[in-house]
Amino acid sequence: MRNFDLSPLMRQWIGFDKLANALQNAGEGQSFPPYNIEKSDDNHYRITLALAGFRQEDLEIQLEGTRLSVKGTPEQPKEEKKWLHQGLMNQPFSLSFTLAENMEVSGATFVNGLLHIDLIRNEPEPIAAQRIAISERPALNS
C-alpha cells in the first residue's frame, strides 16, 4: 500500500480548515519563500511571506477566481558576486494558494521585508424562505 502526503497541498488551501488542519500536522517541507498562514478567527486570515532583499515594485499579487498568486522578480545585480556563503535567496518565485469560496483579499502590505496578505471570509446572507399565497383561481389559463 502506498501513502501519499497531501499536507503540502492542503497548507495552501485557505478556508478549508478542518481538512487542512488534519493533514497539515503530518509534517511538510518548506519552499521558497518561507511563509506563514495565520488564522485570527473564523473569518480572518493572514498570509505572511519573508522576502528579504525584495522591493515592493518586485512583487505582484493576483486573484483569479479562487486562486491567489504571488510572484516576485528581484532586480538582478549588475555584476556577479563571489559568495563564501549564501544563505539568503534572492531569486524569482511564484506561489499560489487556493482559497475557499467566499474568501476575499482585504488588503496587502509590505513592511520590513515581510509581505502580509489579509483575507476575510464573507459568508453570504442565507436566502430567507418566501411565503407563497394560495389563491382559489388557477394560476395558468386553462
Swiss-Prot record:
Indicate the segments forming the sHSP domain, all copies. Answer: 26-137
Keyword annotations for this protein, in alphabetical order, are: Chaperone, Cytoplasm, Stress response
UniProt keyword Protein biosynthesis present: no
Q: What Gene Ontology cellular-component terms does the record carry?
A: cytoplasm
Any Pfam family the entry gives = HSP20
A Gene Ontology annotation in the biological process aspect, one of them, is: protein stabilization
Q: Which InterPro entries match?
A: A-crystallin/Hsp20_dom (IPR002068), ACD_IbpA/B (IPR037913), HSP20-like_chaperone (IPR008978), HSP20_IbpB (IPR022848)
Primary localization class, coarse: cytoplasm
Cellular location(s): Cytoplasm
The family line of this record is: Belongs to the small heat shock protein (HSP20) family.
The UniProt subunit note reads as follows:
Homodimer. Forms homomultimers of about 100-150 subunits at optimal growth temperatures. Conformation changes to oligomers at high temperatures or high ionic concentrations. The decrease in size of the multimers is accompanied by an increase in chaperone activity.
Domain statement: The N- and C-terminal flexible termini are involved in oligomerization and in the binding of non-native substrate proteins, and are essential for chaperone activity.
* NCBIfam families (UniProt xref): PRK11597.1
What's the stated role of this polypeptide?
Associates with aggregated proteins, together with IbpA, to stabilize and protect them from irreversible denaturation and extensive proteolysis during heat shock and oxidative stress. Aggregated proteins bound to the IbpAB complex are more efficiently refolded and reactivated by the ATP-dependent chaperone systems ClpB and DnaK/DnaJ/GrpE. Its activity is ATP-independent.
Q: What is this protein called?
A: Small heat shock protein IbpB
Q: Please give the organism.
A: Shigella boydii serotype 18 (strain CDC 3083-94 / BS512)
